[in-house]
Amino acid sequence: MTKAAELRQKDVAGLEAEVKSLQKAHFGLRMQKATQQLGNTNTLRTTRRDIARAKTILAEKQAAK
Protein backbone atom coordinates (compact mmCIF):
# COMPACT_ATOMS: atom_id res chain seq x y z
CA MET A 1 0.00 0.00 0.00
CA THR A 2 1.38 3.33 -1.05
CA LYS A 3 0.96 6.19 1.39
CA ALA A 4 -0.36 9.51 0.12
CA ALA A 5 2.54 11.34 1.77
CA GLU A 6 5.03 9.23 -0.20
CA LEU A 7 3.19 9.97 -3.44
CA ARG A 8 3.07 13.71 -2.77
CA GLN A 9 6.87 13.78 -2.64
CA LYS A 10 7.13 12.51 -6.23
CA ASP A 11 7.07 14.75 -9.27
CA VAL A 12 4.56 14.45 -12.12
CA ALA A 13 6.75 12.09 -14.16
CA GLY A 14 7.29 9.88 -11.13
CA LEU A 15 3.56 9.74 -10.44
CA GLU A 16 2.80 8.84 -14.05
CA ALA A 17 5.33 6.01 -13.86
CA GLU A 18 3.80 4.86 -10.58
CA VAL A 19 0.30 4.79 -12.11
CA LYS A 20 1.55 2.77 -15.09
CA SER A 21 3.31 0.22 -12.90
CA LEU A 22 0.27 -0.12 -10.63
CA GLN A 23 -1.99 -0.60 -13.65
CA LYS A 24 0.29 -3.36 -14.97
CA ALA A 25 0.28 -5.03 -11.57
CA HIS A 26 -3.51 -4.77 -11.37
CA PHE A 27 -3.87 -6.30 -14.83
CA GLY A 28 -1.67 -9.22 -13.79
CA LEU A 29 -3.73 -9.74 -10.66
CA ARG A 30 -6.96 -9.70 -12.68
CA MET A 31 -5.55 -12.36 -15.00
CA GLN A 32 -4.55 -14.48 -12.01
CA LYS A 33 -8.05 -14.14 -10.61
CA ALA A 34 -9.60 -15.13 -13.94
CA THR A 35 -7.48 -18.28 -14.08
CA GLN A 36 -8.14 -18.96 -10.37
CA GLN A 37 -4.48 -18.66 -9.41
CA LEU A 38 -4.93 -15.67 -7.11
CA GLY A 39 -5.09 -16.69 -3.48
CA ASN A 40 -5.60 -13.33 -1.79
CA THR A 41 -8.26 -11.41 -3.69
CA ASN A 42 -7.89 -8.44 -1.34
CA THR A 43 -4.79 -7.42 -3.30
CA LEU A 44 -7.08 -6.44 -6.19
CA ARG A 45 -8.85 -3.95 -3.94
CA THR A 46 -5.68 -2.47 -2.50
CA THR A 47 -4.07 -2.14 -5.92
CA ARG A 48 -7.17 -0.47 -7.34
CA ARG A 49 -7.22 2.00 -4.45
CA ASP A 50 -3.49 2.69 -4.83
CA ILE A 51 -4.12 3.55 -8.49
CA ALA A 52 -6.93 5.91 -7.51
CA ARG A 53 -4.76 7.52 -4.82
CA ALA A 54 -1.90 8.08 -7.28
CA LYS A 55 -4.23 9.45 -9.97
CA THR A 56 -5.82 11.86 -7.50
CA ILE A 57 -2.49 13.28 -6.41
CA LEU A 58 -1.35 13.45 -10.05
CA ALA A 59 -4.47 15.46 -10.94
CA GLU A 60 -3.85 17.79 -7.99
CA LYS A 61 -0.28 18.43 -9.11
CA GLN A 62 -1.31 19.02 -12.72
CA ALA A 63 -4.07 21.43 -11.66
CA ALA A 64 -1.60 23.37 -9.52
CA LYS A 65 0.57 24.18 -12.53
Swiss-Prot record:
Domain of life per record: Bacteria
SUPFAM superfamilies according to UniProt: Ribosomal protein L29 (L29p)
Coiled-coil residue windows: none
Record GO biological process: translation
HAMAP family: Ribosomal_uL29 (MF_00374)
UniProt record similarity statement: Belongs to the universal ribosomal protein uL29 family.
Name of the protein this chain belongs to: Large ribosomal subunit protein uL29
Organism: Delftia acidovorans (strain DSM 14801 / SPH-1)
Phylogenetic lineage: Bacteria, Pseudomonadati, Pseudomonadota, Betaproteobacteria, Burkholderiales
Name of the coding gene: rpmC
